[in-house]
């Protein structure tokens, strides 16, 4: 089957600082984070541009999830700096939050809503157009057509994970931050996720993925567990 030609992502270059065209879109220098007096990670440097994929490896407790939360702007680092399009950003910065999609361990799926209702609700929160065609395409990308109207509480963990990942296909955000995205997925769903990730990168998107499963073509950042 020939490779698909995904539509390019929306152009956000107008929010650049002067001269940012020559800089990474996302850059971090010396990031550190502690919890309850314990250093979770420190000295993290990274830089991403269009089409870049970074996999974050490490044992359980090494700080992979905490790093994603810092990079997402959900929590502030204790040291270091984070830059988005050449501008320093802090936790909660709208320019970063509006450009990223985050899927964590918790799927964020309302168990009382169906997959289609969950996608419509997530789209409203994100300010994304949720036309019937867009929602149908996102659900189809993850093979959810037959269960799209079933309450999420009646679905398996794997199907709920598919519904969470379908939001990526709908939102078309520039930066994906994903925490163990293939957890609970069968081989078919994992292949569908990989196809969406490949499309995202070919369209100029970026992704940082905390994972135990190696990703083809990814650069690697390895975190060490701290006692």
UniProtKB/Swiss-Prot annotation:
Catalytic activity reported: heme b(in) + ATP + H2O = heme b(out) + ADP + phosphate + H(+)
Compartments where found: Cell inner membrane
Binding site for ATP: 58-65
Record's bilayer topology term: Peripheral membrane protein
GO molecular function: ABC-type heme transporter activity; ATP binding; ATP hydrolysis activity
GO CC terms, sorted: plasma membrane
Top-level lineage group: Bacteria
Pfam families from the UniProt entry: ABC_tran
Domain ABC transporter: 26-227
Main enzyme class: translocase
Single GO biological process annotation from the record: cytochrome complex assembly
EC number(s) on file: 7.6.2.5
Coarse class of the protein's main subcellular location: membrane
Signal peptide coordinates: none
Keywords: ATP-binding, Cell inner membrane, Cell membrane, Cytochrome c-type biogenesis, Membrane, Nucleotide-binding, Plasmid, Translocase, Transport
Record-linked InterPro entries: AAA+_ATPase (IPR003593), ABC_transporter-like_ATP-bd (IPR003439), ABC_transptr_haem_export_CcmA (IPR005895), P-loop_NTPase (IPR027417)
Oligomer and partners: The complex is composed of two ATP-binding proteins (CcmA) and two transmembrane proteins (CcmB).
Function comment: Part of the ABC transporter complex CcmAB involved in the biogenesis of c-type cytochromes; once thought to export heme, this seems not to be the case, but its exact role is uncertain. Responsible for energy coupling to the transport system.
Similarity comment: family membership: Belongs to the ABC transporter superfamily. CcmA exporter (TC 3.A.1.107) family.
Stated name of the protein: Cytochrome c biogenesis ATP-binding export protein CcmA
Native source organism of the sequence: Cupriavidus necator (strain ATCC 17699 / DSM 428 / KCTC 22496 / NCIMB 10442 / H16 / Stanier 337) (Ralstonia eutropha)
Gene name in the database record: ccmA
